[in-house]
Structures are given as structure tokens and as C-alpha cells.
Amino acid sequence: MKSFKYKNLIVLCSIFIISSCSSMDGLRFWKSDEIDPDEPKELVAFSNQKNIVIEWKNSFKGENEIGNFLPDFSAQNLFFSDASGNVSSINASTGDRNWSIELNFLASGTSAGFGLVVVSDIDGNVIAVDQNDGSKLWSTNVKGEVLSKVAIDAKVVVVKTGSGELLGLDRENGEILWSYRSKLPLLTVRGSSSPVIVDDLVYVSFDNGRLG
């Protein structure tokens, strides 16, 4: 008799478990073949839309295939450079070109601020020109390829080379004021992260994974 009761109890428990699982779709371990999990969801329609008005546009003949030549903004002007050595100043309001110069082939650019526009050429020269007319102010060879934008403040221009060296150049004449060299790992890819100056402190990430 006890055996019969136990069998009935087991059957009832089994029925309860099966019925519970069938009503809980989220706990099912199988899915219908009609549902494709990789199918993208339907896009939501947005009613709050605005049209973009183009105030002006300009074009440049140089290329920027690896993204090392982002423009910069300073004193109501935009500054551009490219790998061919073209450096230009554009009025941000009108799109009119203020000036254009040609330098040696460049490795990176463009940083602007405190009256300077700074780029770096393929021979390791950091070149500063005047924001107002593009005249060359100074050039300093840092003995290493510079693939990242420099950082500029009122006193110093901070440069990071591909060999892991960080240098501070005098903003007025380009003289090397100080330098710091990080230890590169045995296997590394040429780094291109840019230094940042905040409250007289320089922040930079090195190829060995350290943040200084």
C-alpha cells in the first residue's frame, strides 16, 4: 500500500514540475526553430528629429588614412594638417581659409593653443608655427618618431615619442626642458596616445600599460 502511495506521489510531482516548466518560457532549455536569436530587433521610430544645416564646407587635398591628423580648434579658428605636409588655418564661423603652408612630410598633427600650431614630421622634428599667419617659430628634433598629438600650455609643449620618451619643450623657443623615458615591453605596437596637461600636471599612458 505504501509503495502505491509513493508511486502516486512521484507521478503527481512529475506532472506538477512538467506543467510548471511549460508555463515558464524563460526557464526552457530548448527554443523554437522558428525564432532566430541573431535576427536584429526592429528599429524604434523617433518623431523628434532635426535637420542639419551646413553653414559651410571646405576640402583638402591631403589624406588621413591612419587617423593621425585630427583637426584642432583655438581662438575661433580650425587648424588642419596632413601627411603630405600641408598645414592650414580656417575661420570656424565662415569657412574662409586664413593661411596655408607646406612643410616636410608629417607623422602627426595637429595641436593648437597659446598662439601655436604644432605638428611633427617623419624625421622626428617637432615644428611650431604662429597661429596668426603660419610663420615658422621653431623646430626641435626629439630623435624619435612622434605619432601622437602634442599637449600645449602657457609654458611647455609636451611630446611623446614612439620609443616611449616623454619630453617637455619650452613653448617660446622649443628648447628641451626635461625628458622621461619609459621601459618598452619586448613585444609592442607603436603607441599613439596623446599626453594631456591639467593644472600643471602631465598625464600620459605608455606602451608598457602604465599611466603616468
Language model: regions and residue ranges:
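Beta-propeller domains
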Residues: 82-93
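Short loop/turn segments that connect beta-strands within beta-propeller blades
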Residues: 91-94, 130-133, 170-173
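Extracytoplasmic beta-rich repeat domains
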Residues: 24-27, 34-40, 47-72, 97-114, ...
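Structural signature of WD-repeat beta-propellers
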Residues: 82-83, 121-122, 161-162, 206-207
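Bacterial N-terminal signal peptides that target proteins for export
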Residues: 2-10
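C-terminal motif of bacterial Sec signal peptides marking the signal peptidase cleavage site
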Residues: 18-20
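Conserved beta-propeller blade signature
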Residues: 77-79, 117-118, 157-158, 202-203
